[in-house]
């Protein structure tokens, strides 16, 4: 996982008024915290953060936070990113300070490749899990899990135990649940309770939080 440089400035003011003023100037309020340090209130450039996160999830990026006046960068990941529901502009960022020798719980996206045999026969591909939780050191976090479904027929599935991963990565889940499956058209019309189908995705200071469980230490 690539590490990105991000400038940050200490912030002494709090509250909705100062936060709105920051946003008008092109910045967003942020906070950095971790298990071994006191929280630090910060501001970061909306443009710089947006450029880094372009095309990737907020939980898939590591940062070197270059805080003005600090002796050294602070390595962190986004724990929570609040977004305006209408404009989709960032409102507030929570950065979680990490240690490269301490394992994290992180969500990693699932990417499906190929057109399955079952789809050629009229079946429907259902992606049940679009993210998988892993435990590993920050330097071993996978960018994504790529699953080739070319040989998958109707009624067949890829389970958690089938997902390729390196020895440095653990799945905390004990159940061998279904990640991807191909179902007959009639079955596809009646998804099981609690499952999210291929199109079943849903999208705070007045916003929605992304990556709320992006990184937590074991």
Swiss-Prot record:
This is one of the proteins that binds to the 5S RNA in the ribosome where it forms part of the central protuberance. GO terms for molecular function: 5S rRNA binding; structural constituent of ribosome. One of its GO terms (cellular component) is cytosolic large ribosomal subunit. GO terms for biological process: translation. PANTHER family: RIBOSOMAL PROTEIN L25/GLN-TRNA SYNTHETASE, ANTI-CODON-BINDING DOMAIN-CONTAINING PROTEIN, RIBOSOMAL PROTEIN L25_GLN-TRNA SYNTHETASE, ANTI-CODON-BINDING DOMAIN-CONTAINING PROTEIN. The gene is rplY. It holds the Pfam family Ribosomal_TL5_C. It comes from the Bacteria. HAMAP family: Ribosomal_bL25_CTC. Belongs to the bacterial ribosomal protein bL25 family. CTC subfamily. Part of the 50S ribosomal subunit; part of the 5S rRNA/L5/L18/L25 subcomplex. Contacts the 5S rRNA. Binds to the 5S rRNA independently of L5 and L18. Residues 1-20, 185-218 are annotated as: Disordered. The keyword Transcription regulation does not apply. This is Large ribosomal subunit protein bL25. Residues 192-218 have a biased composition (Acidic residues). Keywords: Ribonucleoprotein, Ribosomal protein, RNA-binding, rRNA-binding. InterPro entries: Rbsml_bL25/Gln-tRNA_synth_N, Ribosomal_bL25/Gln-tRNA_synth, Ribosomal_bL25_b-dom, Ribosomal_bL25_C, Ribosomal_bL25_long, Ribosomal_L25_dom, Ribosomal_uL5_bac-type.
């Amino acid at each position: 996982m690539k590490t990105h440089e991000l400038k940050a400035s200490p912030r002494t003011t709090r509250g909705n008024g100062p936060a709105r003023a920051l946003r008008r100037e092109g910045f967003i309020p942020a906070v950095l915290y971790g298990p071994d340090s006191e929280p630090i209130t910060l501001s970061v450039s909306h443009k710089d953060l947006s450029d880094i996160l372009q095309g990737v999830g907020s939980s898939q990026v590591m940062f070197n936070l270059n805080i003005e006046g600090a002796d050294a960068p602070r390595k962190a990941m986004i724990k929570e990113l609040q977004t305006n529901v209408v404009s989709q502009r960032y409102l507030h960022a929570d950065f979680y300070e990490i240690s490269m020798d301490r394992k994290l719980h992180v969500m990693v996206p699932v990417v499906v490749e190929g057109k399955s045999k079952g789809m050629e026969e009229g079946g429907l591909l259902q992606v049940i899990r679009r993210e998988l939780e892993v435990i590993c050191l920050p330097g071993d976090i996978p960018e994504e899990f790529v699953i080739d479904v070319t040989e998958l027929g109707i009624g067949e599935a890829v389970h958690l135990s089938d997902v390729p991963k390196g020895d440095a990565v653990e799945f905390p889940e004990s159940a061998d649940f279904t990640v991807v499956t191909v179902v007959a058209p009639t079955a596809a019309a009646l998804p099981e309770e609690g499952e999210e189908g291929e199109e079943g995705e849903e999208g705070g200071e007045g916003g929605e939080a992304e990556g709320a469980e992006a990184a937590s230490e074991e």
